[in-house]
């Protein structure tokens, strides 16, 4: 069994050793809650990695959005290259939940576009938890939604070894039961094909590697792993576990029992609706539910099968759903990153889901069991936590009240200080800001500006562009991919000024930023609260020459507290630097593409590992280029132009390196 082992040329420095020791001691003492209060740029991620290495517990890291989860996942993969680091976020590229608007008698059918790549990573995460303990999963709050019963998932997993007495048709029947499809033409993830005595399977947790089961009579003769694209054999396997193609897969016996319970619940609900003289609703419910029952009976699933998950799991009404947290062993460790934002998100999930489902049940679109296909209530989420470390520069009351220990991490390994804060009057703020932008850009640095409204962000961007400033804005209408593209352009200098509302706070790691301007800083509210201001100030703490300008006519309580807290930290940092003879140095970081962590980072990793493998096996670069060119053409044919462009760049690099 693998152990967590950090691979890094760095050693803990500054406040890190003390914070690591304090938190590890607290965890080993059995304390349930602890807080890591770490300023921006103090190396909280590295501290978390060291705690994982010291405690050796399977770990869940909860982030408040996909982008931050992707960034963390990429960093933990670098720290733990020999261990399993997985990415678990919502697999919907687009999601329109089922809903009914009684005022206009409008039923909105569920409409969703599932990202196959992310679905693969979700399966990879759950199957890793069944097989190993050295597993880190970085997840968004979507991990508190129902996922299917882990016991059923484990029970349905097919375990195969060479020498086992297994009939080929028996294995095929089992694969169909766990929702794999036979497809001899379009061989893809979650399908299998049969060629004579060979059975080829692409597991739900992979898309590039397949498993070939070779039979001799009714015995498994050999199991081999192969490259799906080229068909080349990668190696022999002494054991393979094939996990279900869906987290909601169930055995025939479970499905039969479930159908009987669904029919009973339908009968009871029809009596209630008929007694209330809701004839139309009763007819609608009967028709829709009977259709679902037929689909489950014939196919093993139906559209919206998650609405019957409570029945499939054998749970009582009102009991919490099974989630990713239930796939972890009991002694797991959880980190809640940027907890001041993540915890309120967890709290809000249940109420929004419940209000939407009420009208669906009331008007005969769903059975009451649909209420139990839901995210966890906050109290249920708390009950599933074993031990937790809240991580934030500005922890809230909840975190502090539920922590036995608070470890402060104020000193940065780079010696960087919290930025100097200047307060300037609102009158003439735009002209003053333009002058500051010019001076900052001339020095080769970037600027972040926070406004109070989306309109102001757009208007200011237009104004600056008219003055030939390379400016752009970022707000909630911009999707994740585009957002990461903008951040990358900012880091590369294709954009000098980024303007936003509250999107500039948590998790943006941009060392090139030397000026953060906060417009209308004295407009008290959630965008200018103490927490918000400290987080925004933190965006300037990656550069030794950075400063923050607050444009305000009055000093509010929030401003006063955030300025005093920044000054307190700055004094501690300056004293430490003086004592240890440290000169603050700007963080130098490569511009990594972390778009979704499902595409670019994985492709880069695949590319690097392919090149290493090719070197080990003495595969000529020309042969590798040929393989990538085939894959590029295939991607272009399937209209996967981003993938094709990525492969084109890899081919270009390979050609240049081979000269």
Swiss-Prot record:
Protein name: UvrABC system protein B
Localization per Swiss-Prot or TrEMBL: Cytoplasm
Domain UVR: 622-657
SUPFAM superfamilies the record matches: C-terminal UvrC-binding domain of UvrB, P-loop containing nucleoside triphosphate hydrolases
Coiled-coil residue spans: none
Pfam family, one: Helicase_C
Primary gene name: uvrB
UniProt record similarity statement: Belongs to the UvrB family.
Key words of the record: ATP-binding, Cytoplasm, DNA damage, DNA excision, DNA repair, Excision nuclease, Helicase, Hydrolase, Nucleotide-binding, SOS response
Residue intervals of the Helicase ATP-binding domain: 25-182
Origin: domain of life: Bacteria
């Amino acid at each position: 069994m693998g152990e967590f082992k950090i691979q890094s040329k760095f050693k803990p420095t500054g406040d890190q050793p003390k914070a690591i020791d304090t938190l590890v001691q607290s965890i080993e003492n059995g304390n349930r809650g602890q807080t890591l209060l770490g300023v921006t740029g103090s190396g909280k991620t590295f501290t978390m990695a060291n705690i994982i290495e010291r405690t050796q517990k399977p770990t869940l890291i909860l982030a408040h959005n996909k982008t931050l989860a992707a960034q963390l996942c990429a960093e933990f993969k670098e720290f733990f290259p020999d261990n399993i680091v997985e990415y678990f976020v919502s697999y919907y590229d687009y999601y329109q939940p089922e809903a009914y608007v009684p005022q206009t008698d409008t039923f909105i059918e569920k409409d969703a576009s599932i990202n196959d790549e992310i679905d693969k990573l979700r399966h990879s995460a759950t199957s890793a938890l069944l097989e190993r303990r050295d597993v880190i999963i970085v997840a968004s709050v979507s991990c508190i939604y129902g996922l299917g019963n882990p016991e059923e998932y484990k029970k349905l997993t097919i375990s195969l070894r060479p020498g086992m007495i297994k009939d080929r048709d028996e294995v095929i029947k089992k694969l169909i039961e766990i929702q794999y499809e036979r497809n001899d033409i379009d061989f893809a993830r979650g399908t299998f094909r049969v060629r004579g005595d060979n059975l080829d399977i692409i597991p739900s947790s992979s898309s590039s590697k397949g498993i070939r089961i070779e039979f001799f009579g009714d015995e498994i003769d050999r199991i081999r792993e192969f490259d799906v694209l080229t068909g080349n054999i990668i190696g022999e396997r002494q054991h393979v576990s094939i996990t279900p193609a869906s987290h909601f897969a169930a055995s025939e016996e479970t499905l039969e029992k479930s159908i009987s319970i669904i029919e009973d619940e339908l009968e009871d609900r029809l009596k209630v609706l008929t007694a209330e003289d809701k004839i139309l609703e009763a007819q609608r419910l009967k028709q829709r539910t009977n259709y679902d029952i037929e689909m489950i009976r014939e196919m093993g699933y139906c559209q919206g099968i998650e609405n019957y998950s409570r029945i499939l799991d054998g749970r009582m009404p009102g009991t919490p759903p099974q989630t990713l947290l239930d796939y972890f062993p009991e002694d797991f460790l959880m980190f809640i990153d940027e907890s001041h934002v993540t915890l309120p998100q967890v709290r809000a999930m249940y109420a929004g889901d419940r209000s939407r489902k009420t009208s669906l049940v009331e008007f005969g679109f769903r059975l009451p069991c649909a209420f139990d296909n839901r995210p966890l209530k906050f109290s249920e989420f708390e009950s599933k936590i074993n031990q937790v470390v809240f991580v934030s520069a500005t922890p809230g009351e909840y975190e502090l009240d539920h922590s036995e220990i608070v470890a402060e991490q104020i000193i940065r390994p780079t010696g960087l200080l919290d930025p100097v804060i200047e307060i300037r009057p609102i009158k003439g703020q735009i002209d003053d800001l333009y002058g500051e932008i010019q001076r900052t850009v001339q020095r080769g640095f970037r600027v972040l500006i926070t406004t109070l409204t989306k309109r102001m962000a757009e208007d200011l961007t237009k104004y600056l562009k008219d003055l030939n400033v390379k400016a752009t804005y970022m707000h909630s209408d911009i999707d994740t991919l585009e957002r990461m593209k903008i951040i990358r352009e900012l880091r590369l200098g294709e954009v000098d000024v980024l303007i936003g509302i509250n999107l500039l706070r948590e998790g943006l790691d941009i060392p090139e930023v030397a000026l953060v301007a906060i417009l209308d800083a004295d407009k008290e509210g959630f965008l200018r609260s103490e927490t918000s201001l400290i987080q925004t100030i933190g965006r300037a703490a990656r550069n030794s020459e950075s400063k923050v300008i607050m444009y305000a006519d009055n000093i509010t309580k929030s401003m006063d507290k955030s300025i005093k807290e920044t000054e307190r930290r700055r004094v501690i940092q300056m004293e430490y630097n003086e004592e240890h003879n440290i000169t603050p140095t700007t963080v130098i970081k490569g511009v990594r593409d972390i778009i979704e962590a499902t595409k670019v980072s994985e492709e880069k990793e695949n590319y690097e590992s392919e090149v290493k493998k090719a070197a080990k096996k003495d595969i000529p670069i020309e042969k590798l280029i040929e393989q990538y060119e085939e894959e590029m053409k295939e991607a272009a044919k399937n209209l996967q132009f981003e993938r094709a462009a990525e492969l084109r760049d890899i081919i270009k690099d390979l050609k240049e390196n081979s000269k």
